Amino acid sequence: MTRLDGRVERGNRTRQLVLGRTVEIASVEGLEALTVGRLATELELSKSGVFALFGSKQELQLATVREAARIFTERVVRPAGEVPAGVGRVWRLCELWLEYSRGRVFPGGCFFYGAMAEFDARTGPVHDAVVRAQRDWSAHVERTIEEARTAGEMRADTDVAQLAFELVALMETANALSVLHDEETAYRRARVGIARRVRDAATGEAAPIPEVP
């Protein structure tokens, strides 16, 4: 390994260390709570070193949004994609999302729920990045439902966009109430609601949705 390669590798490790902390801070306190000085102090790094990695507070925020999206994909989207297209994949996607929130992958619950509340009325690159993440997620839920309909496991007259909206609303409400009240009852209610909506849309070709305990 050359000296340059070693510096690049160390820089990448430091960047991941910093981003591991920024997603935690932002999920609880918001993206505006991120500062180079705070991160340098908490992680025992030099301010100049942290600044060199990101260049500005805005780039630090954008990198944090990208890292949160990467983690979300790894924990929710990718595992759900391992289930064959159909009602089972729709159910698994929702289950994984609820577990991602309930298990506090990010200590403040769903990272993007908080980021949307923080940046919904603002303008600029960070707002736009949060919007893209939200649209990508909604589109993925719709696509998963559409695949189930194409596979013959959901009724042909299923309003895909409406069903996706309702499932996302149930998941996000469970997240919000759980974080606010520090309890998990809302997750069961969300699972009951999701199961009911998916069963209502399913055809006889679909595997049965498990009963919610």
Language-model features, listed with the residues they occupy:
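All-alpha amphipathic helical-bundle segments outside canonical DNA-binding/catalytic cores
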Residues: 88, 128-133, 150-166, 185, ...
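Amphipathic alpha-helical segments used for helix-helix packing
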Residues: 89, 104-125
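Hydrophobic alpha-helical connector segments
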Residues: 63, 77-108, 160-167, 209
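Short hydrophobic/aromatic patch on the recognition helix
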Residues: 43-54
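Hydrophobic alpha-helical segments that form the core
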Residues: 108, 113, 140, 156-177, ...
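Basic, helix-initiating cap at the start of DNA-binding domains
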Residues: 1-29, 33-42, 59-62
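C-terminal peripheral helix-coil segments that are non-catalytic and often amphipathic
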Residues: 1-5, 92-99, 135-151, 170, ...
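Alpha-helical DNA-contacting segments of helix-turn-helix folds
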Residues: 54, 59-68
